[in-house]
UniProtKB/Swiss-Prot annotation:
Single GO cellular component term: cytosolic small ribosomal subunit
NCBIfam families assigned to the protein according to its UniProt record, in alphabetical order: rpsC_bact
Protein species of origin: Anoxybacillus flavithermus (strain DSM 21510 / WK1)
Family membership noted in the UniProt record: Belongs to the universal ribosomal protein uS3 family.
Subunit structure: Part of the 30S ribosomal subunit. Forms a tight complex with proteins S10 and S14.
Alphabetized Gene3D superfamilies for the sequence: 3.30.300.20, Ribosomal protein S3, C-terminal domain
Name this polypeptide is given: Small ribosomal subunit protein uS3
Function as written in the Swiss-Prot or TrEMBL entry: Binds the lower part of the 30S subunit head. Binds mRNA in the 70S ribosome, positioning it for translation.
Length: 218
């Protein structure tokens, strides 16, 4: 079933960690909805800032947000003006003290989210879906990936019947749990309707750290 399941969810607790890290009992549902609002707001506001991942941590009445972006300058703004405006807006949205960390992505071509969004934007700009996929694959392999698979689905080229087409290069071992596979989806809004984009990137193997347990007497 490795072909069907989300590769990131399958690896949580093995080589991946949760993107929201906090504990709650009776307030769990409210905090979960708050997380969704924060992610929705940041995704919309930073749509041009090449944001790959948003991590949320909570402690008492404080929210720590880590934004992974390929364009940190756009998120921070001139003299930190943009990130300060962002913090104030999130303070109002959540009613809590918000602290924002910015992490720069050194190799954006190895981030599935950014590759998928790039393919989607090209399709919206009437670039051939085949060309968009092949160019993305070449860039990702040049950046040092071990393998990549891309898939687009919908009314490709304005066809009457929706279909899917995928391209791949290298290996993408979905069943190997120690394989570091990044996966993401994106949507392209065209005059013929939405076209879905999926990207899997294999970045090499990660050996999970084993917790050493000391046995009494040894």
């Amino acid at each position: 079933m490795g072909q069907k399941v989300n590769p990131i969810g399958l690896r949580i607790g093995i080589i991946r960690d949760w993107e929201s890290r906090w504990y709650a009992e009776k307030d769990y549902a409210d905090l979960l909805h708050e997380d969704l609002k924060i992610r929705e707001y940041l995704t919309k506001r930073l749509s041009d800032a090449a944001v790959s991942r948003i991590e949320i941590e909570r402690a008492a009445n404080r929210v720590n947000i880590t934004i992974h972006t390929a364009k940190p300058g756009m998120v921070i703004g001139k003299g930190g003006s943009e990130v300060e405006a962002l913090r104030k807006a999130l303070n109002e949205l959540t009613g809590k003290r918000v602290h924002i960390n910015i992490v720069e992505i050194k190799k954006p071509d190895l981030e599935a989210k950014l590759v998928a969004e790039n393919i989607a934007r090209q399709i919206e700009n009437r670039v051939s879906f085949r060309r968009a996929q092949k160019q993305a694959i070449q860039r990702t392999m040049r950046a040092g990936a071990k393998g990549i698979k891309t898939m687009v689905s919908g009314r490709l080229g304005g066809a009457d019947i929706a279909r899917s087409e995928h391209y791949s290069e290298g290996t993408v071992p979905l069943h190997t749990l120690r394989a570091d596979i990044d996966y993401a989806t994106a949507e392209a809004d065209t005059t013929y309707g939405k076209i879905g984009v999926k990207v899997w990137i294999y970045r090499g193997e990660v050996l999970p750290t084993k917790k050493k347990t000391e046995e009494g007497g040894n």
